[in-house]
């Protein structure tokens, strides 16, 4: 009778350890999906940052006196490129700071494109058209990769918050991941005047 109770206890402990390790592995897999998605976000933002100097130099040749616009784009690019985040340590505040820097670069690029409207000869050049198409494609990829990051973070966050896995997640130190959110300006419809 005593050996039977020991056997049941040993099996219960073994199953508990096995279940715990399976949950841990699931947490690690989900966390790595978030890290992978973040790497792709950084990749497309870097692609955009790499296009900016080419775009600025192309426009600069045709619009020499638009110096303040070029400086604003260059400064915004430098700021956006300087923020590096570790996805495993990322907080809501870190992500907001990163997003703000990227939003500033987007706004500066928007002002640059408005400046270009004053120069029809520049808009007609093949080099500018190519750079503009690449930038538009990159902006679309940014939106896609941000969405994928949010999906991976949502899946991970759901996993670590569901009972009973949330108990193990706390023991193992798995923390909630932040999401990309729309900038405050996105909630306001743009004013279009004809």
Residue map of PLM features:
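A helix-centric hydrophobic-segment signal that preferentially recognizes long
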Residues: 2-194
């Amino acid at each position: 009778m005593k050996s039977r109770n020991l056997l049941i206890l040993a099996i219960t402990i073994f199953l508990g350890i096995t279940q715990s390790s399976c949950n841990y592995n699931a947490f690690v897999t989900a966390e790595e999906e978030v890290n992978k998605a973040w790497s792709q976000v950084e990749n497309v933002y870097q692609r955009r940052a790499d296009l900016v100097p080419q775009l600025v130099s192309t426009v600069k040749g045709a619009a020499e006196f638009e110096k303040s616009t070029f400086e604003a784009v260059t400064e915004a690019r430098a700021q956006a490129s300087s923020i590096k985040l570790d996805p495993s340590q990322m907080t809501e505040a870190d992500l907001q700071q990163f997003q703000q820097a990227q939003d500033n670069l987007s706004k500066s690029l928007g002002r640059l494109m408005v400046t270009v409207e004053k120069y029809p000869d520049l808009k007609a050049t093949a080099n500018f058209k190519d750079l503009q198409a690449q930038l538009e494609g990159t902006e679309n990829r940014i939106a896609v990769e941000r969405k994928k990051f949010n999906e991976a973070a949502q899946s991970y966050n759901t996993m670590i918050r569901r009972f009973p896995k949330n108990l193990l997640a706390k023991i193992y130190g798995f923390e909630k991941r932040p999401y990309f959110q729309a900038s405050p300006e996105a909630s306001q419809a743009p004013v279009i005047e004809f």
